[in-house]
From Swiss-Prot:
Its EC number is 2.7.1.-. Belongs to the fructosamine kinase family. The lineage of its organism: Bacteria, Pseudomonadati, Pseudomonadota, Gammaproteobacteria, Enterobacterales. Transmembrane segments: none annotated. The active site is at residue 194. GO terms for molecular function: ATP binding; kinase activity. Pfam families: Fructosamin_kin. SUPFAM superfamilies: Protein kinase-like (PK-like) (SSF56112). It comes from Klebsiella aerogenes (strain ATCC 13048 / DSM 30053 / CCUG 1429 / JCM 1235 / KCTC 2190 / NBRC 13534 / NCIMB 10102 / NCTC 10006 / CDC 819-56). Keywords: ATP-binding, Kinase, Nucleotide-binding, Transferase. InterPro entries: Fructo-/Ketosamine-3-kinase, Kinase-like_dom_sf. The keyword Iron does not apply. Gene3D superfamilies: 3.90.1200.10, Phosphorylase Kinase, domain 1 (3.30.200.20). ATP binds at residues 92-94. This is Probable ketoamine kinase EAE_16955.
Length: 286
């Protein structure tokens, strides 16, 4: 793998560049993570089994999409590829620090500008991706209520059922979610898709976001994540509101949007997350 990475990075360096440092980083819960120094420049490397190359390719595509918006900072992508055994993603190395109040407010403003970027008539994305390690379908759909009910809540419930986890009648739940959102047809916004404190940090040049699960959806979905994480700086919400105030009805829709993340946690981690997801589902749709 390291030879394949060296070959790709050599194309971006002067002759004679080579690996000078290679340290595995702690906290790689999903993929192995490394700090690599090559040709005097630092890189962040994610790697995993070769079969997971599509996940890294999708992540690179999402980071490049967010970068094109010129509204939020994301790590620059330098290479994505594989050898016979491993796949990898090579990005800019940005040692993360927690957001302070000022930079949290600034990030909130940047997220608001991201949500205002470009005009897209439909909900979805040109390709499927992943929420954490869970596959996320993104087939284009014109009705927001249909998209969210079927491709977010219905999808999670089907995945749960495949693992023997049942939260109620899937068809009835999907219909109930769709009915509650039927009168809400927002302008599609490009979302980060997994906006929590673990995917936001302070870098050398200000706040940045990473590990996206992008799609075009209701901007309220990104903001609905914030109350689920008490450690998330509240200034993110304040900064967002200063640029693009949320519409009436946001607080009523918020519990419905939170179901997507709560169901995903229940599938991934089980235990108390199953109880939390069931309680949230019952309360949101009562």
């Amino acid at each position: 793998m390291w030879q394949a990475i060296s070959n790709l990075l050599s194309e971006q360096h002067t002759d004679g560049a080579e690996i000078e440092l290679r340290n595995e980083l702690p906290g790689g819960e999903i993929h192995a993570a490394w700090h690599l120094r090559f040709g005097g420049k630092d890189y962040f490397v994610k790697c995993d089994e070769r079969e997971l190359l599509p996940i890294f390719t999708a992540e690179a595509d999402q980071l490049e999409l967010l970068s094109r918006c010129k509204t939020v900072s994301v790590p620059q992508v330098f290479a994505v590829g594989s050898d016979r055994d491993y796949s990898f993603l090579v990005m800019e190395y940005l040692p993360p620090r927690p957001l302070d109040a000022h930079n949290a407010f600034l990030l909130g403003q940047q997220i608001a500008h991201l949500h205002q970027w470009s005009d897209q008539p439909q909900f979805g994305l040109d390709f499927d991706n992943d929420l954490s390690t869970t596959p996320q379908p993104n087939a284009w759909q014109r009705r927001w209520s249909t998209f969210f009910a079927e491709q977010r809540i219905g999808w999670q419930l089907e995945l749960a059922a495949e693992k023997g986890l049942h939260f109620g009648d899937i068809d009835n739940i999907v219909e109930s979610v769709q009915q509650r959102l039927s009168s809400h047809q927002p302008q599609p916004s490009l979302l980060h898709g997994d906006l929590w404190s673990g995917n936001c940090a302070l870098g050398p040049n200000g706040p940045y976001i990473f590990d996206p699960a992008c799609y075009w959806g209701d901007r309220e979905c990104d903001l609905a994540m914030l109350p689920l994480h008490p450690e998330q700086p509240p200034q993110i919400y304040d900064g967002y509101q200063s640029v693009s105030p949320l519409p009436a009805g946001f607080l009523e829709r918020q519990p419905i949007y939170q179901l997507y993340t709560l169901l995903n946690r229940a599938i991934l981690f089980g235990g108390q997350h199953l109880v939390t997801a069931q309680k949230a589902l019952d309360e949101a749709l009562q």
